[in-house]
Amino acid sequence: MGIVYSKSDRTFTIQTKNTTYQMQIDAYGFLLHLYYGRKTDGVMDYLLTYADRGFSGNPQDAGNDRTYSLDVLPQEFPCRLTGDFRSPVLDLVNADGSFGCDLRYQGYEICDGKYNLKGLPAVYAAEEEAQTLIIYMKDQVTGLQVELLYGVLPEYDVITRSAKVINTEEDKIRLTKAQAACIDFVHGEFDIISFYGRHAMERNMQRTPAGHGAFVIGSRRGTSSHQYNPMMILAEKETTEDAGTCYGMSFVYSGGFKAEVEKDQFGQTRMQMGLQEEQFSYPLEKGEEFVIPEVMLTCSSQGLGKLSQNLQRCIRKNLCRGKYKEKVRPVLINSWEACYFDFTGEDIYHLAEQAKDLGIDMVVLDDGWFGSRNDDNSGLGDWKVNEEKLQGSLGDLISRINALGVKFGLWFEPEMVNEDSDLYREHPDWAIQIPGRKPVKGRNQLILDFSRKEVVNAVYEQMCQVLDQGNIEYVKWDMNRQLTDLGSEEFYGDRAGELYHRYVLGVYELQERLVTDFPDLLLENCSGGGARFDAGMLYYS
């Protein structure tokens, strides 16, 4: 199966059904990237070129050898400080105020099965389906440790990549950039394929020549966004849907991201993907670690169609979970366009009757069933059934609809709060906002601080009380605005840069608790339509 270490060549070779991925530990302990592409045998270090490149820095270990420079060598996990002036994958501020790190090889481990990422969505697999490679790296001066994680699913030609950063210094360090995956290509002319858009017009394909300099897409919005999808393809020039070689990266994450392709002075190309670095600053005390969300990699020598199929098969079989994983999803009608906020329980029942006549499987009661929610100015955060509006209990309404042979679903927007709500009046500090500044609003609402455990717990308890009232088989989880005013009562000062990422972890925690405690629940992850159409959300949906 998939992973072989050669002691004589100091190479790691990952073999999938149709591809080969190879790395090598060089004489100085740096981990070089040798090859990724069509399946092959042998050691690919002949692809490396050692030449005196003017003004390219040489590490001390290389002595007077001016042909050795990390500024031109392909690397597996490039960092700042080593003389490589291309965009790094990892950057940090050390306890003494210096920048960057110098990671050298320490050891490795190969095991059956696929690694897990606590608190994060990730591809999963049985022991016989996958293997994991862990490569241990260390900065000999500061003691910083990094574990590079590779999950290999040979049948799909998919390799997942993540990394764990561990602070062993006596004092605090601060991560300022954390990308999960990087591939350096020494040779080749490429096109970059990305997917742009806006609300109600997401994921339009754009194909751009990879010229000198950097091409960057990403999201600073706190979600993966309508504007750019966290997926990127690097394709050889002649690649079509059915022929040619191409490489894909898909980020298994639902927050801010950055995907970058950089072509350097010598025509080499670096592709990387991971967390958005703007407003990201993550301190680690001694003994603490940071896990970078994973990226799915795939390579196809049979065109873009095969690349898409690789990712689709892996996502459907080894990322999606739950009761509906292998089932046809129900056909539903949603009350929003039919009623907006103006409805009673009887209106929803009549909608279900008509749905039954049309062969529709489910009715979803959208916005307006809770608190004082009769328009979009109030009520968000108060997840208590408005029985006066429904003219009865939610449980009775669900029972009547189920008696028709129609399933029932319900809308929530768990991450949001209106200032005109009981929750906000009781806990104004639970909203993300900067003290002393009037917050930016979107759709007349603020965002709850899901980086805080007590906020997540409070919303969870409210949702459970509603879900326990009847046979609710479907939840439409909405999220109708982006993050602004990044202020938190818990994460402020030198910890303010944690908020973006911790917020996403809070969303994942709540969704994991819901699908665990309500295993028959089908969760639809809506975000104003397609602002969270990413692999991370598919893990819970």
Specify the residue positions occupied by each region the protein language model found.
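Terminal connector regions
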Residues: 298-330
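Short acidic, Pro/Gly- and aromatic-enriched capping/linker segments at domain boundaries
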Residues: 1-12, 265-285, 520
